[in-house]
């Protein structure tokens, strides 16, 4: 097993580790135990006798010089040039050359007008690799990281990061492809993006095959199908060919076959394109560029398994989430020649180009819930990551079952995770509860938590939330009259992490271990960490608030990009792409010099510090980034950034209760108290993941005063208004402590820490009242709307909003951990509790 440490506890002990092993050799459950192994020195590695004695330990070898990197991975050898163009020059498996080149492909489309006519100019860019790094090197696996961009006539566009994962004696290569958009949205439309491989093909043309997965079964053809009129090829020969057998005709059969192949078309090129979530097409053509394509097959969805081969061997391809992240595809070209080309299209040029422009030339602040009335949309700096794999095979074409199994393994790779009980015992990611069914109310709460997750699992499919730039995200708010999410209404459209559905889903997985919840959270993670945030440019380290377009809102904030959204997936999987993102975030407080999150609320000339940060969600998001950098590298500089802010908050009149608006100096990370003001509402201080970050930090810092401040915050939030004014001596003024169900985690923490039974009761009352009133226990009950939403029977929750669902579920998960014992035992007691609810001084959810 190949292992590495990914995080440390403050005392230097190991917190998280990442491991690589051959899952095919392991059972469904494994136990990982620490063991100290002697490492061979470089001098020993050069000693043949030492090598022989330790041959079982010396596994994968990486040789490097100025011109190339050579990987010796048992039966697999890879030559990687350092010339800046190709990912590799040759891949040999079991002594046979399978691939001779691989390089990034980019097509951009530019709209133009000529003599009053609208034109589209398609431009193909060449790749330029600027850096090749051996990112991970171990006994079982090597990861090669390529960084570069594309060029045309001196113009550089669309940076990329490509990772190639190579395993010992493995016939499979895994790729993680990331591109960043740095184009001009008015003229740089994405027309095609992928990686093109060159593979030698040999032998008779009738022994060359292609296969594509369909909706049902496998589409399979030979380049020269031995089905003829005159002379007629024997049926058994054609039947053997369609089974994928190597044909070696003899005698009269050979004469007939050789005669017919002189007078038939050879299908030199095959193309498959999934152009929507509900349609794909397979086409083919002969080599002549002046000839048309023939339609082979139209279908609904393909999982993306594909292969082609010859007597040389075959290549299998599988692009993960093939139809979900449309438009995707493959083009296999020159199959009847000596060197075939196989392009894996992450964005297929057979589909319409991606238009990155905004939907309007202004913002709609009040009416459509957008950040401001001015336009602030920009796609410059967003990214997208895709994953695909290829496998080398000695067969002329793999079997249908092999393609299915390979594709299934790419879509759902084997991952080992701990049990919920194990993670809970070690307080992984702070405070959260395990499911329990000890009484009627607990059963009802667990039922609602499951209903909520199940609803969104189904809603992704029902609402077609698919496509490269959309897949993974949810919509924000529902329109019950149109029976549709408000996809066209400014800030009500795509959610973009608003009120942290990310944390809800990850904690839901942590406590249940449900595989489907893991996948739902994983897709949300991959989208929100890439498309919703900026990885370069003036907004690097910030994300865009919820909008019709993922990059549409003029509000660019740290909370959308914060590491807290992504730490779960990183520590559970060791995903290397997230390491890039964490490095982007570690010092992203400097982005506050470019974009003051409260810049439109305060006069610049009256400020002492150059920017602002609310204690939550702005400063708390920075804390998540700093905490991640601290625990990954034991870099106490980032711990100190956190404590600087904590000490500043301690000096405020009401400590954590104060503000939450502060002036902020990104260079010193100091906060300056400027009074009791809450731009956007006090609830924003605690509904964007702040409680979860603060609670986890509280145990890492061992600062008792900080814990007391958190507890006091939860207590104060639920005080009657007159008591709030009295305790604060009136300095809170008109500041509302609104939407109290969103503060339930803080209230529960306070009740637990202070042993305050009255606070525990108030916390449960507000949290339960937000979903139960007047004896109605329907919760997340779905209803059927016939003939709506282009469905025979539309399943909906007419009042639903992702904001409410995410916050209610997240708070329930945390509150149960702290004050489960104060939960009413049955729903009749719950009804009595919520009937006593006093709403004066609070804004209803």
Residue ranges, per PLM feature:
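Conserved beta-strand->loop/alpha-helix structural units within folded catalytic cores of enzymes
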Residues: 170, 175-176, 378-392, 494-522, ...
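Glycine- and aromatic-rich loop/turn segments at beta-sheet edges
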Residues: 2-5, 424, 454-490, 531-552, ...
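Terminal, non-catalytic domain-edge segments
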Residues: 399-410, 628-680, 685-845
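Solvent-exposed beta-strand/loop surfaces of large extracellular or lumenal domains
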Residues: 1-17, 355-367
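Beta-strand/loop-rich accessory regions of lumenal/periplasmic or secreted enzymes
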Residues: 72-418, 471-477, 493-496, 530-531, ...
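Terminal connector regions
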Residues: 37-74, 394-429
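Surface-exposed interaction regions enriched in Ser/Thr/Asp/Glu
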Residues: 24-42
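Substrate-binding groove/exosite segments of carbohydrate-active enzymes
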Residues: 298, 304, 348-349, 356-368, ...
């Amino acid at each position: 097993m190949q292992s590495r440490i990914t995080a440390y506890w403050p005392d230097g002990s190991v917190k998280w580790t990442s491991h690589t092993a051959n899952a095919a050799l392991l059972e469904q459950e494994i136990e990982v135990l620490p063991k100290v192994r002697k490492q061979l020195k470089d001098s020993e590695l050069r000693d043949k006798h030492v090598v022989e004695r330790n041959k079982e330990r010396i596994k994968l070898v990486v040789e490097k010089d100025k011109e190339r990197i050579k990987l010796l991975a048992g039966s697999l050898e890879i030559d990687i040039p350092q010339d800046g163009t190709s990912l590799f020059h040759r891949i040999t498996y079991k002594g046979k050359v399978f691939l001779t080149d691989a390089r990034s492909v980019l097509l951009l489309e530019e709209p133009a007008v000529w003599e009053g006519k609208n034109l589209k100019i398609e431009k193909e860019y060449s790749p330029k690799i600027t850096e090749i790094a051996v990112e991970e090197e171990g006994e079982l696996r090597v990861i090669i990281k390529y960084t570069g961009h594309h060029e045309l006539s001196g113009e550089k566009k669309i940076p990329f990061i490509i990772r190639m994962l190579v395993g010992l004696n493995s016939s499979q290569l895994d790729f993680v492809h990331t591109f960043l958009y740095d184009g001009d949205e008015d003229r740089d439309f994405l027309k095609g993006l992928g990686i093109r491989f060159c593979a030698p093909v040999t032998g008779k043309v009738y022994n060359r095959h292609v296969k594509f997965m369909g909706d049902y079964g496998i589409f399979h053809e030979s380049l020269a199908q031995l089905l003829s009129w005159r002379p007629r090829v024997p049926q058994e020969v054609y039947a053997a060919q369609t089974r994928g057998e190597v044909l070696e005709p003899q005698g009269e059969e050979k004469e007939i076959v050789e005669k017919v192949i002189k007078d038939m078309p050879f299908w030199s090129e095959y193309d498959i394109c999934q152009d929507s979530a509900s349609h794909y097409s397979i086409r083919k053509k002969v080599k002549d560029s002046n000839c048309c394509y023939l339609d082979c097959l139209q279908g609904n969805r393909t999982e993306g398994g594909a292969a082609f081969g010859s007597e040389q061997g075959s290549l299998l391809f599988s692009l993960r989430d093939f139809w979900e992240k449309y438009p995707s595809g493959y083009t296999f070209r020159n199959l009847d020649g000596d060197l075939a080309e196989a392009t894996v299209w992450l964005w297929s040029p057979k589909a319409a180009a991606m238009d990155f422009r905004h939907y309007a030339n202004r913002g709609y602040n009040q009416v459509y819930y957008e950040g401001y009335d001015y336009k602030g949309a920009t796609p410059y700096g967003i990214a997208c990551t895709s994953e695909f794999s290829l496998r080398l095979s000695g067969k002329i074409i793999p079997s249908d079952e092999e393609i299915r199994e390979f594709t299934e393994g790419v879509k759902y790779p084997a991952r080992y995770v701990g049990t919920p009980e194990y993670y809970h015992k070690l307080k992984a990611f702070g405070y959260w509860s395990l499911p329990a069914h000890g009484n009627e109310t607990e059963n009802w709460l667990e039922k609602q938590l499951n209903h909520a997750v199940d609803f969104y699992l189904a809603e992704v499919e029902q609402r077609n939330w698919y496509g490269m730039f959309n897949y993974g995200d949810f919509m924000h708010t529902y329109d019950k009259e149109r029976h549709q999410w408000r996809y066209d209404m400014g800030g009500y459209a795509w959610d973009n992490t608003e009120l942290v559905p990310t944390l809800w889903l990850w904690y839901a997985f942590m406590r249940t271990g449900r595989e489907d919840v893991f996948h739902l959270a994983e897709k949300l993670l991959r989208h929100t960490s890439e498309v919703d945030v900026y990885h370069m440019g003036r907004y690097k380290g910030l994300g865009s608030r919820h909008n019709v377009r993922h990059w549409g809102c003029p509000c660019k904030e740290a909370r959308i990009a914060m590491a807290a959204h992504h730490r779960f997936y990183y520590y559970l999987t060791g995903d290397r792409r997230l390491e890039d993102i964490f490095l982007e975030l570690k010092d992203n407080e400097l982005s506050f010099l470019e974009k003051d999150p409260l810049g439109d609320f305060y006069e610049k000339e009256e400020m002492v510090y150059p920017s602002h940060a609310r204690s939550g969600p702005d400063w708390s998001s920075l804390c998540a980034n700093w905490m991640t950098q601290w625990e990954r590298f034991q870099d106490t500089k980032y711990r100190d950034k956190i404590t600087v802010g904590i000490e500043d908050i301690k000096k405020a009149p009401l400590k954590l209760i104060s503000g939450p608006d502060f002036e902020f100096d990104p260079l010193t990370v100091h906060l300056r108290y400027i009074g009791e003001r809450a731009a956007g509402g006090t609830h924003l201080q605690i509904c964007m993941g702040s409680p979860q970050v603060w609670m986890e930090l509280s145990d890492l810092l061992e600062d008792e005063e900080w814990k007391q401040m958190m507890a006091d915050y939860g207590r104060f939030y639920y005080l009657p208004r007159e008591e709030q004014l009295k305790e604060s001596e009136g300095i809170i003024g008109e500041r509302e402590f609104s939407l109290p169900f969103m503060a339930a985690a803080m209230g529960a923490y306070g009740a637990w820490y202070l042993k305050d039974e009255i606070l525990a009761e108030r916390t449960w009352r507000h949290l339960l009242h937000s979903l139960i009133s007047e004896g109605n226990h329907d919760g997340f009950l779905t209803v059927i709307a016939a003939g709506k939403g282009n469905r025979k029977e539309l399943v909906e929750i007419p009042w639903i909003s992702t904001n409410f669902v995410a916050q209610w579920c997240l708070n329930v998960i945390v509150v149960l951990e702290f004050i489960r014992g104060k939960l009413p035992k049955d729903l009749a007691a719950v009804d009595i509790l919520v009937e006593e609810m006093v709403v004066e001084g609070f804004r209803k959810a």
